Regions:
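Acetyl-CoA-dependent GNAT
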Residues: 6-10, 16-80, 95, 99, ...
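Core beta-strand residues in small-molecule sensory/regulatory alpha/beta domains
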Residues: 51, 131-132
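Conserved acetyl-CoA-binding loop-helix of GNAT-fold acetyltransferases
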Residues: 82-96, 117-122
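Conserved GNAT acetyl-CoA-binding A-motif
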Residues: 99-108
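Conserved beta-strand-loop-alpha-helix junction that forms the acyl-donor binding cleft
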Residues: 107-117, 134-140
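Conserved active-site tyrosine of GNAT-family acetyltransferases
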Residues: 120, 125, 147
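Terminal substrate-recognition subdomain of acyl/acetyltransferases
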Residues: 140-156
Length: 156
C-alpha cells in the first residue's frame, strides 16, 4: 500500500539522493536543497514523500495555481516496476479533483521516458503537445510531451 505524506526537512537527504539517480537518465533536473526547502514551505506547492510499509520509496512535487490547474512538477520513485508511481499518482489525482477542486491536472514528461508516458495514458491523461528540444541535457537537448486530464475526464 502506498501513502503520501508531507516532506519534512529531515527527508531532504533521501530526496536529493533519489533525485540525483533520476537525473542521470535525464528524467528530472537536480534542485538544490534550498529550492526543495522553499517548495516545502510554499503553501501552493505540495512536496510529498511516497511511502510503502513505512519506507520512503519516492517523492513528488505538485503546484497549485489560481486558475484551478494542478501541475505535477516531478515524481521520482526509487523502486521501479512495482506500481508505486501509479498508485502515488492515483492518490494525487484523487486529492486534486476531490479535495481541492482542480479543473485541470497537467504535467510534462521527457519524450524518452516511454514507460511514464504509457502510465499517464493508462491513467487517462491526454497529449496536449510536444515542446521540441526545450531542455538542455549534456551536449544536446531533449523534448518533452505536455499531458493533462480534466475533471470531467477523471470523473468518467
Amino acid at each position: 500500500m502506498v501513502t503520501l505524506r508531507n516532506t519534512k526537512e529531515e527527508d531532504l537527504e533521501y530526496v536529493l539522493g533519489a533525485e540525483y539517480k533520476a537525473s542521470v537518465d535525464a528524467y528530472v533536473i537536480n534542485w538544490s536543497e534550498e529550492k526543495h526547502l522553499g517548495a516545502i514551505e510554499d503553501k501552493l506547492v505540495d512536496h510529498k514523500i511516497i511511502e510503502s510499509e513505512g519506507r520512503s520509496i519516492g517523492y513528488l512535487i505538485a503546484n497549485r495555481n489560481p486558475d484551478d490547474n494542478y501541475e505535477l512538477m516531478r515524481i521520482v520513485v526509487s523502486e521501479k516496476g512495482k506500481g508505486y508511481g501509479k498508485e502515488a499518482i492515483k492518490l494525487l489525482l484523487k486529492f486534486a479533483f476531490e479535495e481541492i477542486s482542480t479543473h485541470r491536472f497537467w504535467l510534462d514528461v521527457r519524450m524518452h521516458n516511454t514507460y511514464a508516458i504509457r502510465l499517464y495514458e493508462n491513467l487517462g491523461f491526454k497529449e496536449e503537445g510536444i515542446l521540441r528540444e526545450c531542455v538542455k541535457y549534456k551536449d544536446g537537448y531533449v523534448s518533452v510531451k505536455v499531458m493533462s486530464i480534466l475533471r470531467r475526464e477523471y470523473e468518467i
